Amino acid sequence: MSRALRRALLVSLAFIVVAVAGRARAATADGPLGKVRRTNDRIMGLLRKQARSPAGAKPIDRELTRVVAQFLDFPELARLALGRHWEARSATERQEFSELLRQLIERSYLKQLRSNLNYTVRYLGEKIVGDQAEISTSIEVKRKGRSEALVIQYKMRRGTGGWMVYDVITDDVSVVRNYRSQFNRIIQRQSYNALLEKLRRKLKDPA
């Protein structure tokens, strides 16, 4: 699998599972697996609506981002991604960084939803320890006549907003660790402000 495709999956699969094969594992409606399924159902409904009425894409995009905001723990993801540099930042700086990262992830997510990726998902297990959970899935990706399998793990935690995803791991590659490595390298070689500027420029990039 190409690096570009893997990067796309790391973001898009953090929020959506397209089809679930096999019998459901035991899971309560308000548990982590239940949260994933409800989110998936809502997203798929919105995508079907968008396909029927392309002219209404913008309102649907806004609803998609709202659904994602209720599923992905952006503040926790931002804190973990910035790593040891988080403590040195003021409350205002933390909020700014979290918002920039949120916008970048959401934009990438919406882009991937409109791609031609075709994949199905099987749940391998759900593990809950206190307020932490891990959902393991096997995902078969079909692209240009080829089929490849990935094992995706969703890291979730339970907070005031219920169960939310804060990291995704595929092929032993963690979204959080990947971000943290990139951000730390930029801060060490340049500065924290240089990192913010790079994020802002990325947001302005139409690609």
Segments and roles (model prediction):
Residues 5-10:
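N-terminal export leaders
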Residues 11-19:
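Bacterial N-terminal signal peptides
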Residues 20-28:
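Sec/Tat signal peptide C-region and signal peptidase I cleavage site
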Residues 29-109:
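Early exported N-terminus immediately downstream of N-terminal targeting peptides
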Residues 101, 125-127, 139-141, 154-156, ...:
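A mature extracytoplasmic/lumenal domain signature
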Residues 107-148, 199-207:
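Surface-exposed, charged secondary-structure patches
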Residues 149-177:
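Short beta-strand edge/turn micro-motifs at domain boundaries
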Residues 167-207:
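Low-complexity, intrinsically disordered terminal/linker segments enriched in charged
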